[in-house]
Regions:
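Conserved donor-nucleotide/metal-binding helix-loop-beta segment in metal-dependent transferases, i.e.
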Residues: 96-123
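Rossmann-like NAD(P)H-binding beta-loop-alpha module
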Residues: 117-147
Length: 203
C-alpha cells in the first residue's frame, strides 16, 4: 500500500487503468492523432505508462498550467489549425465530450472553447465568470473574491484553441499573484482583444 501512495495522481489506477492512460485513450478515440504530454518530475513514471504512444514535452520547473503550455511553443509553431489542451488528471473525460468541444470550436469559429460544469460544491475549482451570459474569464480558486466563491460553474480543464491566436497570447501571459502562469488567463486576454470564445457545458 505504501508503494501506491508514492504514485503521482496521473499514475493512480481507476478500474485497472492509469488516469493518464485513460485521458490519452479518450483523446485518441476522439480522432486526435498526434498527442503530446507535458511532463516534469514525474517524467519517468509517465513514460513507463505511455511508452511511445505520445510525444513528450519537458517542463523543468512547475510554474503553472500556462507555463506547461509555453514549453510546447516550439512544437505548436510547426502546426496550424487547432490544439486541444487537457489536464492529465481527468479520467472520466469521454471521447464524445472531446468531440463536442472540438466540433463547437470549428462550427462556431471560436478562438477558444472551454469545457465547464455546474457542481454544488465548487471549492477547489477555478470559477467561470460570465458577462451577458458569455464566458468572459476563468478565475483560479486562490484569486477569487469572496463574492465569486458562490459561483457554481467551474472550469473542467479541457480547452480547444486556434493555434495562431494562442501563440500570440502566450507571449504576453503574466505571472499570477502566486508566481504561476495560468492557461485560464488566456481566456480573458482573448476576450479583451474581442476574439470569439465560448464553452461547452458538460452534463
Amino acid at each position: 500500500d505504501k508503494m501506491k501512495s508514492k504514485k503521482s495522481k496521473l499514475a493512480q489506477t481507476i478500474y485497472g487503468k492509469e488516469v493518464i492512460k485513460r485521458v490519452v485513450n479518450s483523446v485518441k478515440k476522439a480522432g486526435i492523432e498526434e498527442v503530446g504530454v507535458v511532463v516534469g518530475e514525474n517524467k519517468e513514471e509517465i513514460e513507463s505508462i505511455l511508452k511511445d504512444e505520445v510525444k513528450y514535452i519537458y517542463q523543468e520547473q512547475c510554474l503553472g498550467t500556462g507555463h506547461a503550455i509555453m514549453q510546447a511553443i516550439p512544437y505548436l509553431e510547426e502546426k496550424s489549425g487547432r490544439v486541444l489542451i487537457l489536464n492529465g488528471n481527468i479520467p472520466l473525460i469521454t471521447e464524445q465530450t472531446i468531440q463536442k468541444i472540438v466540433d463547437k470550436s470549428i462550427k462556431e469559429d471560436e478562438v477558444a472553447t472551454i469545457l465547464t460544469g455546474i457542481i454544488s460544491e465548487p471549492k477547489g475549482y477555478g470559477r467561470v465568470i460570465r458577462k451577458e451570459n458569455k464566458i468572459y474569464e476563468v478565475i483560479e480558486e486562490t484569486d477569487l473574491e469572496e463574492v465569486q466563491k458562490g459561483i457554481l460553474e467551474v472550469n473542467a480543464g479541457v480547452y480547444c484553441f486556434k493555434i495562431n491566436e494562442l501563440l500570440e497570447i502566450l507571449g504576453k501571459l503574466q505571472k499570477s499573484s502566486m508566481g504561476l502562469y495560468y492557461i485560464t488567463d488566456v481566456i480573458k486576454m482573448m476576450n479583451t482583444k474581442g476574439l470569439k470564445t465560448g464553452g461547452v457545458l458538460v452534463e
